[in-house]
Amino acid sequence: METPAMFIKRCSRSIFLQVVIGLVIGVICGVGIPDLAVQMKPLGDGFIKLIKMLIALIVFCVVVNGISGAGDLKKVGRIGLKSVIYFEILTTIALVLGLVVAYSLGLGSGANIHLNELPAGDVALYTGRTQEIHGPVAFLMGLIPTSVFSAFAENDILQVLLFSVLFGSALNLVGEQASGVARLINEFSHIVFRIMGMIVRLAPLGVFGAVAFTTARYGVDSLSHLGALVLVFYATCLVFVMAVLGSVLRLSGVRMLPFLRYFREELLIVMGTASSDAVLPQVMRKLEHMGIRSSTVGLVIPTGYSFNLDGFSIYLTLAVVFIAHVTGTPLAMTDLITILLVSLVTSKGAHGIPGSALVILAATLTAVPAIPVAGLVLVLSVDWFMGIGRALTNLIGNCVATVTIARWENDIDMPRAQAILDGRLEAPAKADGEPLKRSAVAGEGKLHG
């Protein structure tokens, strides 16, 4: 039987257990001492800001190191094209699933809420910002930074990714003459990852602060309001993860449950902070540790964070149909097709917009004349809870995408991946912060560090 001393020792070595404890204490504090708990919000916000502080540098280091040592630049382009095609297919499936579930269940039907009963003030906060969502040409132009420094200063990951791909490609083409620069960036990445390891140690504190504030602010029973929407959303996300993503992962030779268990610490942090940004560096590191080439991880994950938003896609069509039903708006087949087509465009505009979920939802409602935009206020009270599901599903979707594309490209050491997922090889050290390296030939060599 485990003694208290043994349990404390085990907790001191496990970030996973520390995060669980932080989450539980956060709930207790939120229920028992709400006045104090609401003041804990800066702990969660501060943790996320510390993580975001390094994301651009980590993306730069991982992508440059991966591409400069990849050898074949045509392969890099091929991975990028396959990623975009994969993202479009999976997000379309997610959009259709949300639409079909909400419509077939009649989600929100019978509420008969009148538009004059809805407060317009909160809606204006989001509808007034829909101009931030640009068309395709403006979006593509927005990928080009004003300067290299502005991309890093504004933490615009897509702009950083573009520069990183160009920089890594140039290093690759220059070859031996630039070997000193390549070594310098590789050594710099060790420093960045060491800092990240120090920050990750603060995850339990960040989760505690975020959960304590949320419990005190919204209450344990706050899900009862608009509970059907929240429950159906989570059920739909679960079906998507286990059935759709599970099937995709199975085709790659990996089972979903061991895969989720491997990322359990990251999923817990996302659950506590409602932000998948908080775990991006750790996720990239673990995917490399599984045996996936660093250049593939460095291309797929940052791009997926903007284009492969499966959880957000489910939320978008589900919420639009819900708002139509609760406001008594009849939906014809042409309306459903319009919702789907509009969502295919607006769902790609979420990158870099604060409060993006509600802003994109407002933009979608604005583009579908049949549905009143004022209905947006109906989902405001539960948006934070749905945000947890969005972030979890988005994260899992991007991890699955990386494995799938790596499998297509033969960029994953499958025996190593299976050994790690089965527990025959250890996961990377919990917070040592060291970047992982892999040989340039897919399927050969081992991970080090």
From Swiss-Prot:
User: What would be one Gene Ontology cellular-component term for the protein?
Assistant: plasma membrane
Q: What does this protein do?
A: Responsible for the transport of dicarboxylates such as succinate, fumarate, and malate from the periplasm across the membrane.
Q: Which residues cross the membrane?
A: 16-38, 53-71, 84-106, 157-176, 197-219, 229-251, 311-333, 358-380
Q: Name one Pfam family in it.
A: SDF
Membrane topology of the entry: Multi-pass membrane protein
Q: Where in the cell is it found?
A: Cell inner membrane
Q: From which organism does this entry originate?
A: Pseudomonas aeruginosa (strain ATCC 15692 / DSM 22644 / CIP 104116 / JCM 14847 / LMG 12228 / 1C / PRS 101 / PAO1)
Q: Please tell me whether the keyword Transmembrane is annotated for this protein.
A: yes
Question: MF terms per GO, please?
Answer: fumarate transmembrane transporter activity; malate:proton symporter activity; succinate transmembrane transporter activity
Q: Which family does it belong to?
A: Belongs to the dicarboxylate/amino acid:cation symporter (DAACS) (TC 2.A.23) family.
Q: Which gene encodes it?
A: dctA1
The UniProt record lists the keyword Membrane: yes
Q: What is this protein called?
A: C4-dicarboxylate transport protein 1
